[in-house]
Amino acid sequence: QADNPYMEVLFDKMQLRTFTYNFTFSPKNRQETEDVQKIIQLFRFHMSPELKGKNNRFLTLPSEFDIHYMYQAQDGQASENDYYNKIATCVCTGCDVNYTPDGVKSFEGGAPTKITMSLAFQETELLTKERVAEGF
């Protein structure tokens, strides 16, 4: 019996990458509060499936998201930031909202003075060497 001089590694599987983004909203008036509510509702809507078919027996897939890191160039145009890795098409897997991050504080009428939102995304494709070479 001879010793094997080569290292062996058991490759099991790749994991899909996940990304989390945290936002803090501090609306100053009623219009800004309504805008924040629309943003939250938009993400909650697009992360959810839809019932379809006769007797609502089937679920459709949730919306997909293409996330890009952008910056404003000196000429005022938005440009993609190449210093960050690209992100493949994602689905939103979580939308956590806290309406009382600093305790219960509200404007007249009950609207919260501060809201935090955490969004979780997961890519829909596995990362390969070819995709890494493309900047992912």
Feature names for model-found ranges:
Residues 1-136:
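Acidic, Ser/Thr- and Gly-enriched intrinsically disordered low-complexity segments
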